[in-house]
């Protein structure tokens, strides 16, 4: 009896091992298939910034630049089951943001009619993180999109399908929308990567998205302006006001100077490219009881409002303002004083999509 039981377990183990060995693993990094960043072919890791910027930016900017926020991988396969395995180097979660958002991946698929679908995966967060997707159907004509973790650094990642199934990495074409922003644009506090507003926007517009956002450190700094300025973009988004509060160390005049420098630098190389400057998405809501923060956000947003009005009046017809009112966050939209939840992320993405649609129609 014991021998029969042992042989049964042994048979199951061998069958499971054989099945696991039948997967073929595809490495997007080796295939230069990482999207969502600048000069991806030059990067041999999952960072968003190239090595030469390490000596030019402040330490926290470099550290956050190693996070894979906004990075994504497109591929086609006729496999009905997909397994993702990878390793991250940082903490799995934060007090105000779950593991699935900080360290998880997220899988979508665009069908042959251009409609997006979402795939639910079973996940296991151990030393090697795994997401397994089963019974997807054989969607050979679909383009899958895998979003990488928002607030963690990926050391390695592989996509596994059965050995007899086709698999091919894809790359988006067209001029990208480049986003320079703060923690909100980096993805705090979406519950999963596909719900970060930049990733939602990427599914709603016909352009690739490049995410250059740094939690607490979106400050319109010269090295990052130089970095994004090398891209021939469809639109530049400067969403840094949440990290540029007016304090004793930063006056309204100094904030205006930062905005002026950023726009002037971009205009030297891209005189006609649309630039969007965004007010603080939070604040301005009397139903949220935080008078100090509301006033802080109002003051810095007022500087942005005045700047865009002045520059547009002087002749720059391709400079735009996205207002707090157009974004429309409310008492159901945030996890704290500023960071949007999934509802807030959708509101931000929708506001950008509407404005960008108008801009690109011109």
Task: Give residue ranges: language-model regions.
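Structural recognition of the beta-strand scaffold that forms the well-ordered cores
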Residues: 176-179, 208-212, 235-239, 274-278, ...
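N-terminal secretory targeting modules
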Residues: 2-8, 15-176, 357-361
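Substrate-gating cap/lid alpha-helix
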Residues: 283-322
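The substrate-binding groove and active-site-proximal loops of carbohydrate-active enzymes
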Residues: 241-255, 290-298, 336-343
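Catalytic nucleophile-elbow at a beta strand-turn-alpha helix junction centered on a G-D-S/GDSL motif
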Residues: 174-198
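Oxyanion-hole/transition-state-stabilizing segment in secreted/luminal serine hydrolases
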Residues: 193, 201, 219-260, 265, ...
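Histidine-centered active-site loop/cap adjacent to the catalytic His
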Residues: 336-362
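Short helix-loop-beta junction
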Residues: 198-211, 309
């Amino acid at each position: 009896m014991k021998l029969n039981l042992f042989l049964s377990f042994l048979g199951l183990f061998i069958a499971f091992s054989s099945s696991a060995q039948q997967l073929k693993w595809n490495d997007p990094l080796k295939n230069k298939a990482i999207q969502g960043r600048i000069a991806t072919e030059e990067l041999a890791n999952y960072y968003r910034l190239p090595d030469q910027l390490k000596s030019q930016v402040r330490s926290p900017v470099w550290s956050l630049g190693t996070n894979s926020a906004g990075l994504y991988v497109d591929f086609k396969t006729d496999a009905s089951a997909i397994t993702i395995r990878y390793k991250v180097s940082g903490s799995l979660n934060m007090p105000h943001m779950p593991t699935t958002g900080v360290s998880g991946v997220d899988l979508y698929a665009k069908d042959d009619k251009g409609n997006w679908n979402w795939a639910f995966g079973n996940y296991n967060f151990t030393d090697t993180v795994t997401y397994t997707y089963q019974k997807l159907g054989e969607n050979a004509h679909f383009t899958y999109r895998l979003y990488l973790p928002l607030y963690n650094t990926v050391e390695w990642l592989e996509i596994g399908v059965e050995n007899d199934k086709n698999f091919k990495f894809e790359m988006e074409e067209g001029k990208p929308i480049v986003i320079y922003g703060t923690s909100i644009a980096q993805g705090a506090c979406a519950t999963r990567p596909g719900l970060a507003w930049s990733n939602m926007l990427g599914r709603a517009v016909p352009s690739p998205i490049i995410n250059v956002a740094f939690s607490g450190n979106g400050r319109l700094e010269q090295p990052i302006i130089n970095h994004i300025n090398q891209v021939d973009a469809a639109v530049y988004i400067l969403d840094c006001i949440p990290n540029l509060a007016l304090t004793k160390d930063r006056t309204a005049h100094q904030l205006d100077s930062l905005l002026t420098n950023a726009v002037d630098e971009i205009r030297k190389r891209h005189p006609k490219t649309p630039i969007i400057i965004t007010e603080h998405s939070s604040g301005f809501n009397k139903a949220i009881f935080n008078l100090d923060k509301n006033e802080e956000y109002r003051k810095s947003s007022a500087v942005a409002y005045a700047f865009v009005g002045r520059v547009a009046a002087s002749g720059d017809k391709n400079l735009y303002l996205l207002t707090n009112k157009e974004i429309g966050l409310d008492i159901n939209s945030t996890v704290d004083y500023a960071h949007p939840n999934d509802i807030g992320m959708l509101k931000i993405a929708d506001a950008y999509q509407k404005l960008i649609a108008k801009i690109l129609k011109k």
